[in-house]
Amino acid sequence: MLVHKQKCRVCGNPNLKEVIDLGEQYFQGCFVKDGVQPPPRRPMPNVIVRCCPEDHEDACGLVQTLHSIDTDLLYCNYWYESGISQTMRDHLQGIVNTALDITGSKSGKVLDIASNDNTLLRNYPKEFTKIGIDPSSIAARQTDKDIQVINTTFPSKQVNNLIEDNSADIVTSIACYYDIDDPVRFAKEIKRLLSTKGIWIFEVAYWKSLLDNLAYDSIVNEHIVHYHLQPLEAIMKKAGLKFFDVQKTPTNGGAIMCYITHEDNFEYDNRERRQNILNLKIEEYEAYLDTDKPYVEFREKV
């Protein structure tokens, strides 16, 4: 089922302005292979719009696709495996190391949403309870004895039945949050699962980097939202969460690593991390991301 979105996925603003129309495209996350469920052959529109802060004082500025599709269709024949690339294996190990450094944890419960082939989770010491959540056929094939794989989307009733509230010390979701049709609900469910001093680390492609690099080939129908800091902060506020750090990374042409915790947890607050957040806010303000200017320039160059 193809759904035409009539409002912003974060703040509900109905004033959506077109950024660019890239025409109809086939699913990018699937390949035709013998003996494997063939992907849908029907293309879908790839139109990008933005929530306009100029038109409504509560607008968040999110950039998003105008359409979305059933995730069962997107992931029925998903091909990408994290462990194929040494670069990605090193990157995911670095994320785990950072999470352990921040929390100081020697044991506990860790969740990886969009766990794929379990590459990230394998980096945790054996003292941790490891849970992966992923709807893909790749996740369904994993057989690690010390990793519980829940082969479904997040959030879901199945996850709720299997994971207790306030039990997760570290949650990661790498390169998946931009695929989520209801990011506010997703964040609220993360909050429900996080322990009192738990942290959520996620990495997403950075919209400003895409604009700067003219990377229109990164605009695919799997990625239904394109994030910068302003709409992400709006999401966290709605969910009772907050940023305690943010860092730019070179992943896939430019991304941001986001560090989140409960809004009333000040365990990880320090001057350097606050400055990182401020620096990105200044950079986005100076890029006029809340105006038509960068989007008109982008469209004309494409």
Q: For the regions a protein language model found, what residue spans apply to each?
A:
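N-terminal juxtadomain amphipathic helix
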Residues: 1-86, 247
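A SAM-dependent methyltransferase catalytic signature shared across enzymes that methylate proteins
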Residues: 10-17, 229-246
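Short, glycine-/aromatic-enriched active-site segment of Class I SAM-dependent methyltransferases
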Residues: 27, 202-225, 229-232, 236
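Extended interfacial segments that mediate partner engagement and assembly in macromolecular machines
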Residues: 40-47, 56-142, 220, 294-302
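Conserved SAM-binding strand-loop segment of SAM-dependent methyltransferases
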Residues: 145-161
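A conserved beta-strand element that flanks and buttresses the S-adenosyl-L-methionine
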Residues: 172
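A short glycine-rich, Lys/Arg-flanked "PGG" loop and its adjoining helix->strand segment in the class I
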Residues: 184-199
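Flexible, glycine-/basic-rich loop-and-beta segments that form/coincide
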Residues: 252-299
